[in-house]
Regions:
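Alpha-helical substrate-recognition element adjacent to the catalytic core
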Residues: 2-116
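C-terminal cap/substrate-recognition subdomain and adjoining C-terminal extension
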Residues: 84-257, 262-269
């Protein structure tokens, strides 16, 4: 089973902004009481469950059982995220902590970041079956379930069950994010913290877009559909050459999904 990262497992753009702002704050204040590590990241992400696709932990627990029973041999992340590789590792490790299991076997990182080649086994920003085989060294005829919110033509063939999901996006207001952080007790001295972090995050010119209750119900329905498709993949082992469009029709605010190399670079988004 192969997962995309951004807008498939969750929505991590704002989290990335906050994480960068927090690191800058800790560095500028020369705070030795806070260690920037996986434990801190886990505590931060726990404050913002909205950034996780609904029931993604349940979905991963389902796949955990499949791996334990040897029904699923490998689980991978195949991403075009333009942040540092450690960013994807933080997110991967977070999920593994939540399910108490080392479920992911590999992260296939972006082909290039800022013009510099990162993942040496990749040949293109596009996700392709040939690059996947090359990077993972699995047999070419392996049956694969691939989940991504973008459709990549070269990831569609007779050996791939392609679950083309609706992108998951959930914005949080910056002030709300900072309030939750300050109320968490993670830092002992919050003096100037709000102003400093807010000032840093405003550099991104990020426009908050609220989410309706109806849209959140759609997200929950999509997650149920994902689980149904995974059941089908493991139960029948039937592979399809055409993508499974999981409630894409609900996506009335599609956000440049034809651009395959998703990035943490923020663009203005309007209602």
């Amino acid at each position: 089973v192969v997962f995309d990262l951004d807008e498939t497992l969750g929505y991590f753009m704002e989290l990335g902004m906050f994480w960068d702002a927090l690191k800058a704050y800790i560095k500028n204040k020369n705070s030795k009481k806070i260690t920037i590590d996986q434990a801190l990241f886990n505590n931060i992400l726990d404050l913002y469950p909205e950034f996780l696709r609904p029931n993604i932990i349940g979905i991963l627990n389902y796949l955990k059982k499949k791996k334990e029973r040897n029904h699923c041999h490998k689980l991978m992340i195949y991403t075009n995220n333009q942040g540092p590789v450690e960013w994807a590792k933080y997110i991967m490790n977070y999920f593994e902590t939540k399910i108490n299991y080392k479920i992911f076997d590999q992260i296939i990182a972006a082909f290039k970041v800022q013009g510099q080649k990162v993942e040496l086994c990749r040949t293109t920003h596009m996700k392709t079956h040939s690059d996947l085989i090359k990077c993972t060294k699995i047999p070419e005829n392996t049956h694969i379930c691939f989940l991504d919110d973008v459709f990549y033509p070269d990831m569609s063939n007779e050996n791939i069950y392609y679950i083309n999901v609706k992108p998951y996006v959930h914005d949080l207001d910056f002030n709300e994010m900072i309030t939750r952080f300050l109320n968490s007790g993670i830092i002992d001295d919050p003096t100037s913290c709000r102003a400093d972090i807010l000032e840093f995050m405003k550099r991104y010119n990020y426009i908050y877009v609220g989410k309706t209750g109806a849209a959140q119900e759609v997200d929950k329905a999509v997650s149920k559909k994902i689980l149904q498709h995974l059941h089908t993949f493991f139960k029948t082992k039937v592979v399809l050459s055409t993508a499974k469009n999981v409630d894409k029709s609900y996506n009335s605010t599609k956000r440049n999904k034809n651009v395959p190399n998703k990035s943490r670079t923020v663009k203005n988004r309007h209602k």
